[in-house]
């Protein structure tokens, strides 16, 4: 799958498609990836109103096989994967014994085994962590990143555009469910998952088959979209980004993803005791959404002041293309209510805490349809 470019940068199977479309390519986690094509705002709007197509082949895929595959993931992930049925996926965190977050992932149950999608920048770290904590189990852990290309088709028209290429009824596919089927004639996995806050699908297929499907979806009306729009979309949807909202010094409870933490499953997971203590004793910090009430845009790393004292940090911020307001995520002391100030070039700008997500789509998909 992977070719080498500009020193050590890797390229996805769609690199030539990106060049042909005039994409601006950047180094992202060691991959030469498209950050934008027509422009971030236009691509963002296309996903919210029609459908956008992303190349996310840089994401890592790790397969778990063998008699202890499920037990291994019960030990490694915060989610109770024993509850996942065939064709079902689940979002989870991977933790250190301290409770800090190694990564956030999605696990797909495939028969007796699993496919786990990890963040590109964390792939090697994750593999080492997985193997270190399961050395006593009968499980085969394989890096299959180079065996898959991954396309994400997101937006209200995603189902209509993808259905002609899929052997299977997408309208019956619920949120976090997937089909092992044929797409455009080749073997593929089609999942109703995403990272945008819209309905949509992620399609795993063999690298050699990815360019053809990409071109046919673009011809059908999907707008090519880059990592820039992917970031503004996920921020409006209140979704965490590893390296911003999540890191090894931050627990899943602090990051507000406790829905993916199952503290009472039979197999104790790495970091479970630390998270149980934190739940009993209280958080050190909490993640909140905010809107600026003054001029400016909050950016990653800007300080936060509560009661005139520096007490937190902005993790993500942008001018929301959908809402037309400056929004962001920040860590603040757990007792913080109402609002705070963001220091933009040392100038305090009032910010109001608001509920997450900033944007919630109107649902008209089948029961349990994707939130993106």
Curated annotation (Swiss-Prot):
Keywords of the record: Aminotransferase, Transferase
Assigned EC number: 2.1.2.10
Any GO molecular function: aminomethyltransferase activity
Recorded family membership: Belongs to the GcvT family.
Pfam families assigned to the protein according to its UniProt record, in alphabetical order: GCV_T, GCV_T_C
Organism: Rubrobacter xylanophilus (strain DSM 9941 / JCM 11954 / NBRC 16129 / PRD-1)
Highest taxon above the source species: Bacteria
One GO location term (cellular component): glycine cleavage complex
Enzyme class: transferase
Name this protein carries in UniProt: Aminomethyltransferase
Reactions catalysed: N(6)-[(R)-S(8)-aminomethyldihydrolipoyl]-L-lysyl-[protein] + (6S)-5,6,7,8-tetrahydrofolate = N(6)-[(R)-dihydrolipoyl]-L-lysyl-[protein] + (6R)-5,10-methylene-5,6,7,8-tetrahydrofolate + NH4(+)
Record has Transport as a keyword: no
Record function comment: The glycine cleavage system catalyzes the degradation of glycine.
Disulfide bridge positions per record: none
Oligomeric form and interacting partners: The glycine cleavage system is composed of four proteins: P, T, L and H.
Keyword Transferase: yes
Gene3D superfamilies membership: Aminomethyltransferase beta-barrel domains, Aminomethyltransferase fragment, Probable tRNA modification gtpase trme, domain 1
One biological process term in Gene Ontology: glycine decarboxylation via glycine cleavage system
């Amino acid at each position: 799958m992977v070719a080498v470019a500009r020193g050590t940068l890797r390229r996805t199977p769609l690199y030539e498609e990106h060049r042909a479309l005039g994409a601006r390519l950047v180094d992202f986690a060691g991959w030469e990836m498209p950050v934008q094509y027509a422009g971030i705002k236009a691509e963002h709007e296309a996903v919210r109103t029609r459908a956008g197509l992303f190349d996310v082949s840089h994401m890592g895929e790790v397969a778990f096989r063998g008699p202890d595959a499920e037990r291994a993931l019960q030990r490694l992930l915060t989610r109770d994967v024993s509850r996942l049925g065939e064709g079902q996926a689940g979002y989870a965190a991977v933790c250190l014994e301290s409770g800090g977050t190694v990564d956030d992932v999605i696990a797909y149950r495939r028969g007796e085994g699993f496919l786990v999608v990890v963040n590109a920048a964390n792939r090697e770290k994750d593999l080492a962590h997985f193997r270190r904590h399961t050395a006593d189990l009968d499980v085969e852990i394989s890096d299959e990143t180079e065996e898959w290309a991954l396309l994400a088709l997101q937006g209200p028209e995603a189902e209509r555009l993808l259905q002609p290429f899929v052997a299977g009824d997408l309208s019956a596919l619920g949120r976090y469910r997937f089909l092992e089927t044929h797409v455009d004639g080749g073997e593929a996995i089609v999942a109703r998952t995403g990272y945008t806050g819209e309905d949509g699908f992620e399609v795993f297929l063999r690298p050699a088959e990815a360019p053809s499907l990409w071109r046919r979806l673009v011809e059908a009306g999907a707008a090519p979209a880059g990592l820039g729009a992917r970031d503004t979309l996920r921020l409006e949807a209140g979704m965490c980004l590893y390296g911003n909202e999540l890191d090894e010094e931050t627990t899943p409870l602090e990051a507000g993803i406790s829905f993916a933490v199952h503290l009472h499953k039979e197999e104790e997971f790495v970091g479970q005791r630390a998270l149980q203590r934190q739940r009993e004793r209280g958080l050190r910090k909490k993640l909140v959404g905010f809107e600026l009430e003054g001029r400016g845009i909050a950016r990653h790393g800007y300080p936060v002041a509560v009661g005139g004292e520096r007490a937190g940090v902005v993790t993500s911020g942008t001018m929301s293309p959908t809402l037309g307001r400056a929004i962001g995520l920040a860590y603040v002391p757990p007792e913080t209510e109402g609002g705070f100030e963001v220091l933009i070039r040392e100038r305090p700008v009032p910010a109001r805490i608001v509920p997450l997500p900033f944007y919630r789509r109107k649902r008209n998909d089948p029961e349990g349809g994707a939130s993106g």
